Curated annotation (Swiss-Prot):
Pfam families: SepF
Taxonomic classification: Bacteria, Bacillati, Bacillota, Bacilli, Lactobacillales
Biased composition annotated in UniProt, kind: Basic and acidic residues: 38-47
One GO-annotated biological process of the protein: division septum assembly
GO cellular component, one term: cytoplasm
Composition-biased stretches (Polar residues): 26-37, 48-61
Name of the molecule in the record: Cell division protein SepF
Subunit structure: Homodimer. Interacts with FtsZ.
Alphabetical keyword list: Cell cycle, Cell division, Cytoplasm, Septation
Transmembrane segments: none
């Protein structure tokens, strides 16, 4: 469209043919937009009740999983299998080695150290022959060295 046609259309108005084309096109655009709006609206079903699974800041009802620390008193090396399962399942474990001899204790500590390293956990001595093993989701605060007397 040239400059002279634009000026004449501006002064004289738009010819009827072009006016009706624009109106027709805008009606199609409007009907397309309403279809999109209708498609994005959820269907209403009066028999169903919908509850939000997301908790809001104002109404925070969070359900927390109960955390437990398991206590084990192994007497043989094969008892360590259950300790390892607990750590792999995200549970903290206190292991009391009072029933084991020194060689067995070293084997178990080596095994647990490797397991704790694999799950990015932590292992600390909290007493004579007593160790705390925690997986990644536990945080130990404070200094436990005062419990051991070291």
């Amino acid at each position: 469209m040239s400059l002279s046609e634009k000026l004449s259309n501006w002064f004289n108005g738009v010819p009827e043919e072009e006016y009706y084309e624009e109106v027709t096109d805008s009606k199609q655009a409007v009907s397309t937009n309403t279809d999109v709006t209708r498609a994005s609206e959820p269907e209403k079903d009066n028999n169903r009740q919908v509850m939000s699974l997301m908790s809001s800041k104002n109404n925070s009802t969070t359900v927390q999983r109960e955390q437990k620390i398991m206590v084990f008193d192994p007497s043989v090396f094969s008892d360590v299998k259950n300790i390892g399962k607990m750590i792999l399942n995200g549970r903290a474990v206190i292991v009391n080695f009072r029933k084991m001899d020194e060689n067995q204790i070293h084997r178990v500590i080596d095994f647990l150290s490797g397991l704790i390293f694999a799950v990015n956990g932590d292992m600390q001595r909290i007493g004579e022959k007593i160790f705390l093993c925690t997986p990644k989701n536990f945080k130990i605060e404070g200094d436990l060295s005062n419990l051991t007397g070291r």
